[in-house]
Regions:
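Nucleic-acid endo/exonuclease domains
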Residues: 532-649
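Intrinsically disordered, low-complexity N-proximal targeting/linker segments that flank membranes
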Residues: 336-427, 435
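Short Cys/His-centered divalent metal-binding micro-motifs
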Residues: 446-477
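Histidine-centered nuclease catalytic patch
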Residues: 76, 417-451
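Structured, charged N-terminal subsegments at the starts of enzyme catalytic cores
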Residues: 246-315
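C-terminal, well-folded lobe of enzymatic/effector domains
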Residues: 484-540
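Hydrophobic, well-ordered secondary-structure elements that form the walls
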Residues: 427-429, 456, 593
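Basic- and aromatic-enriched surface patches that contact anionic nucleotides/nucleic acids
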Residues: 1-254, 295, 320, 326-334, ...
Length: 649
């Protein structure tokens, strides 16, 4: 099939671009390299479509075929979007992304290279031809400029015209299109086919395909889901489409596999989506009110939400009683502490959904307990993890909130409803970073969870980098008991810098005791320690910040590197993020920066920047197919080399 025919079919609706969650992810370098390959006649790969039923004539790409089916373009979405945007001179209707990536591509008649518009060297220079204008106006639109540039040299003029003609003929190029058809081609089968064919490119998830099929029959599904995601984002919680779809699937089918949605009609899906959105908002309110988990950084265990949404489905969208709520939250906290859903997500979710349907929350807890060898207990060593990306950072925040830990200066309990909804609450290093670095402690030791506590911004500024032996003594004298509310050992000897490891061990023991007491109270029944449950999600909530946070203080050059990546349209990383074993779900390390879906966003292998890995952590990361870098310089060289190779295409 010719490229022009594919684009015409997109306009006509015979081929639709599916409603995948990622939108357009290519960078300008990729667009330029793609057209360089087309111009040189290099192979660009085939295309893959999936023939699926369409119950409505309205789809993302136009109207459906007359036989009630539609061809969803699975492999080639980025390429077709690029071809459409450049040849038509505008992004397609379904476009979501940075439109500048598709506009301004120019061709140099002399060097035969493609570059994006740069006024300094292209404005008024006839050697540079606007590629979109060429496709729109044809060769005739460029003849005057070519004649002037050739300056009466007939041979040179012929060369220029031949080069322009080679560009316009790109749309006439024939490419191979494979079509997946047949009632036996389930979502699981189609995903497997796609990922085998497209092993080196952007991966297609089962959620991608399920959403594509849903949007073929209900085009408003994706905008409706995005509206819910935007509302939660305004409240401080960033979720993804795939996550929301997983919740809907659990509510409607009681299963984890997206293939189960194939049997759900549009009317039921619409009803289930509304119910799920309401349930998630209800859960966020309850988690903020009962556990104090009121912003995205501390909301761990997101993969457990489908199970909790399913429970609410059984009870009309509300907890039937406080006992059920507390026991569910007991299960939820333990599930994220032990990585219940970070490995084989669908397997664990199916087990939990089945347990919930068969025996309620008690069966859920029993399944989790058995998976942990019969014990659900927090040990002091569990708090050894470092940084805000550790699984136990949310637990520290939870304990601070539910027990009403006191601020060191004001004495105010750090509960909800204070300080503009905690917008000025900050993470405080009990032993200041600067002093620990002076004494030779590593980044991981400095940023250990057991060295964190939460204070108001004003208190943090007052303490600054004071010697802990001095300022802790002042606090205990002025406000007896305040340190104990933050689980800070009162043995003065432990406040000395040289005794920092012993301080850590003592505080970990105190935190473990507090955690076990509270989690047991959740299991046994409603606790007298209650927080007011908000009636609606707050908007524009400011997450807790780290006082004096400076990326370069811990990782030299990180701030500059992140700025460069943003300018290059590369994916933004997760900062201070836990990296897990993809097979077992066990935590490996906490990375300074982590690109779970590659630097280009769902293209390539996961990338990890982790300066202080142990040999065991390094081996585990390599076994999990992570690309690991220990410095920003090494990562920058890797990125520069990759871009140079792409530019040479």
């Amino acid at each position: 099939m010719q490229i022009s025919q594919i684009l015409d079919k997109v306009d006509a609706g015979d081929i639709a671009l599916p409603e995948f969650q990622r939108g357009y992810v290519w960078t300008r370098d990729q667009v330029r390299g793609f057209f360089q390959s087309l111009y040189r006649g290099y192979p660009i790969g085939g295309f893959l479509t999936w023939s699926t039923k369409a119950e409505t004539a309205d789809t993302r790409g136009g109207t459906t075929g007359k036989d009630g089916t539609i061809q969803l373009l699975l492999d080639g979405q980025q390429r077709v979007t690029t071809l459409y945007g450049v040849t038509r001179g505008r992004p397609p209707r379904f476009f979501e992304g940075n439109s500048s990536t598709l506009t301004g591509l120019h061709f140099n008649l002399q060097t035969e290279s493609f570059e994006f518009y740069a006024p300094g060297k292209m404005k008024g220079n006839p050697v540079w031809v606007d590629v979109s204008a060429l496709f729109q106006g044809g060769l005739g639109s460029q003849l005057l400029a070519v004649t002037q540039l050739a300056d009466q040299d007939a041979a040179l003029q012929g060369t220029f015209i031949e080069r322009l003609n080679r560009i316009t003929q790109i749309k006439d190029r024939t490419v191979h299109v494979d079509e997946v058809t047949g009632a036996d081609k389930s979502i699981d089968v189609v995903v497997d086919i796609f990922n085998r064919v497209n092993s080196g490119g952007t991966k297609l998830s089962k959620g991608d395909l399920a959403l594509a099929a849903i949007c073929a029959t209900w085009p408003a599904a994706r905008p409706t889901m995005n509206e819910a995601l935007d509302n939660w984002s305004d409240a401080g919680f960033d979720f993804k489409l795939d996550w929301l779809l997983r919740n809907v699937n659990a509510v409607l089918t009681g299963e984890a596999q997206f293939s189960k949605l194939a049997d759900v009609d549009v009317a039921l899906f619409r009803t289930g989506l509304k119910e799920t959105v309401d349930s998630v908002s209800y859960l966020l309110n309850a988690l903020g009110g009962r556990l104090g988990l009121d912003h995205g950084r501390v909301l761990n265990g997101r993969a457990a939400f489908p199970v909790m949404s399913r429970l609410l489905h059984h009870h009309g969208g509300r907890f039937p009683d406080a006992m059920t709520r507390d026991r569910l939250f007991h299960w939820y906290v333990h599930s994220f502490l032990w990585g219940r859903h970070t490995g084989a997500t669908e397997t664990a979710l199916n087990q939990d959904l089945q347990a919930l349907d068969d025996g309620g929350v008690d069966r859920l807890i029993d399944v989790l307990r058995r998976s942990r060898g019969g014990l659900l207990t927090v040990r002091p060593d569990d708090f050894v993890g470092s940084s805000m990306g550790s699984r136990f950072y949310p637990l520290l925040y939870l304990l601070t909130r539910v027990y009403g830990a006191q601020d060191f200066v004001s004495g105010v309990p750090l509960r909800d409803g204070m300080l503009g909804r905690l917008s000025s609450l900050q993470v405080h290093h009990i032993f200041p970073k600067a002093r620990l670095y002076e004494h030779g402690y590593s980044r991981a030791e400095v940023n250990a969870v057991a060295n964190f506590c939460f204070l108001t911004q004003d208190t943090n500024l007052r303490i600054g980098a004071k010697n802990p032996a001095e300022y802790l003594e002042e606090i205990e004298t002025r406000m007896p008991g305040a340190l104990a509310t933050q689980w800070i050992p009162t043995d003065r000897a432990l406040w000395q810098i040289e005794n920092y490891p012993d301080f850590q061990a003592a505080r970990r023991a105190l935190l473990a005791d507090a955690a076990n007491d509270f989690l047991q109270a959740l299991h046994d029944g409603p606790s007298p320690v209650e927080l007011q449950v908000p009636t609606a999600l707050a908007t524009t909530r400011t997450p807790v910040s780290v006082a004096g946070s400076d990326d370069d203080e811990d990782i030299p050059g990180l701030a500059a590197l992140l700025s460069e990546l943003a300018e290059a349209d590369l994916a933004a990383p997760e900062l201070d993020s836990e990296v897990s074993d993809p097979r077992t779900g066990a935590a490996i390390t906490v990375a300074a920066a982590y690109w779970p879906q590659g630097l280009h966003g769902e293209v390539g292998v996961p990338v990890v920047l982790a300066p202080d890995t142990t040999p065991q952590e390094q081996a585990a990361l390599e076994a999990g197919d992570y690309r690991v870098f220990h410095s920003t310089d090494a990562l920058r060289r890797f990125i520069d080399n990759a871009r140079a190779e792409q530019a040479a295409v």
